[in-house]
Regions:
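Conserved pre-ATP/AMP-binding loop-to-beta segment of ANL
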Residues: 27, 42-45, 165-166, 171-172, ...
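Structural core segment of the AMP-binding/adenylate-forming
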Residues: 80, 111-196, 626-631
């Protein structure tokens, strides 16, 4: 595979696009992609897998030939269990080599449905039903994880399953530990199949189904959203995923000497594509850095040792990971192998980029993507000007525009350069709509443009700037406040590790800005000090937070992105508790996400006389909130 020319500006992207994607000899499926890589790079290492995320342990090494053989065996095992091409195999697994076998073998046999193990059991069951799942693959009972307990509690609710298959991490342990653990645990639950035993009996050189996979066949479902109710399922075709791998390879110029560290979960498109299919497409090596990835403190503490030992050339993370790595000394470590680090999922504060690069000498490249676009959409050019705070230039073959909509969400026109509007996507990696048809209202603009719901602008040079998420905007008396400007200012305080700004309800203004702060380990700063800092550094007077609340740890999603819905619920709770306790001291407030109402406040109220109860209801009526009163 010829090396890609370094992308400096938009003209280089346009030069690549002079060769249509259809003329780039793309594989017809992810299975054919892995087959080609096995033919070209058979004995090269595809995966180096760690069980503990430690630099001291010896990895399990898997060649491209072995990877393709295990993927083929997995596809055949699923076929023997009765899985058809239109049916799904769901997985609830940490980052293990078998997870890759299930993903790519599942796509060869049917459709893979990736499920976040941290979801509530009810949401997991809904995703299994919605995806037409017939086989479920999860973790065998194992110390330190409750995955099996979650699945065991759901078995009776899922009679449509043909089989439940378990991956046993004990099989990866040395013989004495393996046998001791299995003896202590006893036999697997009745009716449950062992993954490694199941695939061992299947051929590794052909698909027994004889299936001819077409580029437009659905390969996978990835869930997205779901702060209330069931997450949305985004189908990806084989063409979507192969095109994404090709585009990422062109953009990053992955080659056989690259080593990509994977710390993000394999139920998320970033882990699967950036540190999975894209490097596999080009014969690179993936370091699977432990089952829990970045959630494992050992991986964070050993991160720079791992970079040095494995000669890691790039990795992908989110801002919270970079903030954590800043606390780990890298002095004396040979980091010369690193070409760049990618940051996505949330805007990375400019000050955090500056601190990280000053400490490590490493170039941080911000990008942007989303599940509905298979993964990546834009990236700062690796060979050109990197504009801190920008999510860079669109990736090759990915179309991006900003649309101006009216108050009802109707398309008015395309935005002028630097004019803020809704960011819209089109191209070979964009999905065709959510599996649940009722989720597809108002997501398309014009001729096949997907409305991301993100607000942004594109400057004269093609650089894209996010200005906020439409639902993240703080609306103070009709004035839109971008939370990012507050967060950027707070990150400049030396004690701040993470900052997140949201709106708190206000009877007069609708919302007022507030901020949550997680301090750096060992650092100290009072809320008063941080408020004073904000008043001096937040550039817009109306955006200066009215309150700053210190918290021990920022709520995050499974991939480490700050989970603002939890902060909004907490802000509502704080306001209602403060206000209602002026009427009665022992009122308790609980605010929850509700599928019908969005946010619902439950107030547990002692016996009140008629006057105080009327005063409480008048107070609550001043907020645009749904609430319930409960007598205690």
């Amino acid at each position: 595979m010829n090396p890609s020319p370094s992308i400096v500006g938009l003209s280089d992207i346009e030069a690549l696009e002079r060769v249509p994607l259809e003329q780039r000899d793309l594989p017809s499926s992810t299975y054919e992609l892995l087959q080609r890589s096995a033919q070209r790079h058979g004995q090269r290492i595809a995966l180096s897998c760690l069980l503990h995320g430690s630099a001291a342990e010896e990895p399990l090494r898997i060649s491209y030939a072995e990877l393709f053989a295990r993927v083929t065996q997995t596809a055949n095992a699923l076929h023997r269990l009765g899985l058809e091409s239109h049916q799904a195999v769901s997985f609830l697994l940490p980052n293990l080599p078998q997870t890759h076998y299930v993903i790519w073998g599942g796509e060869a046999a049917g459709i893979v449905n990736a499920i976040n193990p941290l979801l509530e059991p009810e949401q997991i069951a809904e995703l299994i039903r919605a995806s037409n799942t017939r086989v479920l693959v999860t973790l065998a009972p194992f110390p330190g994880t409750d995955l099996w307990q979650k699945v065991a509690g759901l078995r009776a609710q899922l009679p449509e399953l043909y089989a439940i298959v378990v991956v046993d991490p004990a099989n990866l342990l040395p013989a004495p530990q393996r046998e001791a653990l299995k003896a202590q645990r006893g036999p697997l639950p009745e009716g449950v199949l062992d993954f490694d035993t199941l695939i061992a009996d299947c051929p590794a050189d052909r698909l027994e189904s004889g299936r001819a996979i077409h580029p437009d066949d659905v390969a996978s479902y990835f869930h997205t959203g779901g702060t209330t109710g069931t997450p949305k399922l985004a189908p990806h075709s084989h063409f979507n995923e192969v095109a994404m791998a090709e585009i990422m390879g062109l953009n990053a110029d992955y080659g056989v000497d690259d080593v990509l560290l994977c710390g993000l979960p394999l139920f998320h498109v970033n882990g699967v594509m950036v540190t999975g299919l894209a490097p596999f497409h080009r014969g690179a090596q993936v370091l699977l850095a432990g089952p829990q990835g970045y959630r494992n403190p050992t991986l964070i503490q050993d991160f720079w040792k791992l970079v040095e030992r494995y000669r890691v050339t790039s990795f992908s993370g989110v801002p919270t990971i970079y903030a954590a790595l800043l606390q780990v000394p890298s002095d004396g470590r040979d980091l010369s192998s690193l070409r760049f680090a990618l940051c996505g999922a949330a805007p990375m504060p400019v000050e955090l980029i500056r601190q990280f690069e000053a400490r490590t000498g490493l170039k941080v490249i911000e990008g942007y993507g989303l599940t509905e676009g298979t993964c990546g959409t834009s990236c700062n050019p690796r060979g050109g000007e990197r504009r801190p705070g920008s999510i860079g230039l669109r990736l090759p073959y990915c179309q991006v525009k900003v649309a101006v909509l009216d108050g009802e969400g109707n398309y008015l026109r395309d935005a002028a350069p630097n004019e803020v509007g809704n960011l819209c996507l089109k191209g070979p990696t964009v999905f065709k709509g959510y599996l649940q048809q009722d989720r597809n209202r108002d997501i398309w603009i014009g001729d096949g443009w997907f409305n991301t719901g993100d607000l942004g602008r594109i400057d004269e040079d093609g650089y894209i700037w996010l200005t906020g998420r439409s639902k993240d905007l703080i609306i103070r008396g009709g004035h839109n406040i971008d939370p990012q400007m507050i967060e950027e200012a707070l990150h400049r305080h030396p004690a701040v590790a993470l900052a997140a700004a949201v709106g708190k309800p206000d009877a007069k203004a609708g919302e007022l800005p507030v901020a949550y702060i997680q301090l750096k380990p060992g650092a100290s700063a009072s809320e008063e000090e941080l408020l004073e800092h904000a008043s001096r550094h937040v550039p817009e007077r109306a955006a200066v937070p009215k309150d700053i609340w210190l918290i021990e740890s920022m709520p995050v999603t499974a991939v480490g992105k700050t989970f603002k819905p939890a902060l909004r619920l907490d802000a509502i709770r704080r306001v209602l508790e403060e206000e209602s306790r002026r009427i009665a001291e022992d009122i308790r407030v609980e605010v929850v996400a509700d599928e019908r109402h969005g946010q619902l406040a439950h107030l547990h109220v002692p016996a009140l006389d008629e006057r105080r109860r009327a005063a409480l209801e008048e107070l609550l009526g001043g907020y645009a909130l749904n609430y319930r009163l409960h007598a205690v």
